[in-house]
Amino acid sequence: MDIHDAIHARRSVKLFTDRPIAREQIERLLEAAAQAPNHRMTQPWRFYVLGPEARRAYGAVLGARKAKKVEDPEAARAVVEKVTAAEAALPCEIAVSMVLDASPEIREEDYAATMMGVQNLMLAAHAMGLGTHLKTGAVMDDPRARAAVGVPDGERIVALIQLGEP
């Protein structure tokens, strides 16, 4: 697939088949991500392919955050259950973090490089016939989300990529 075609045709996909993504496909996507430019060759990105338990744990954290906006306790429990189940059902989810440099200038450059890696991964997935959906937001800074995903201190979660066959 021509890169221009991939750029113009790629769309966020929110519904996937339940078919798992092969390890070889994931490795190929991670190799594409690692080709992103990065100043000073810091290679600040880290990719965590979440297994079913990590997806479920992350879903519980996300669901609990969303449930705080719901006044009725029963409805709040339903939100947690729905979000947890939706995350657990994903065929693949990849958490993307970056190593935090002490220098604010380098941190900014590293964030840009990491997100270029995300774009590479998403375009490569599209070229392989896979769909992606990029997730970001305040939940990324939640210590419970970090624990669920397994991101160590010294790294910041910048995105989650949901991946599957459309």
Model-based region annotation:
Residues 1-89:
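N-terminal amphipathic, basic helical "cap/leader" segment at the start of enzyme domains
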Residues 25, 52, 144-145, 151-152:
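Short Asp/Glu-rich motifs
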Residues 33, 94, 100-147:
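Small-aliphatic-rich amphipathic alpha-helix that forms the alpha element of a beta-alpha
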Residues 43-44, 135, 156:
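Residue-level detector of family-conserved "landmark" positions at structurally sensitive sites
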Residues 52-54, 99-100, 165-166:
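Short loop segments at secondary-structure junctions
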Residues 87, 94, 160-162:
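C-terminal edge-of-domain segments
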Residues 89-92, 130, 153-157:
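Short coil/turn connectors at secondary-structure junctions
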Residues 149-166:
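A glycine-rich helix N-cap at a beta->alpha junction
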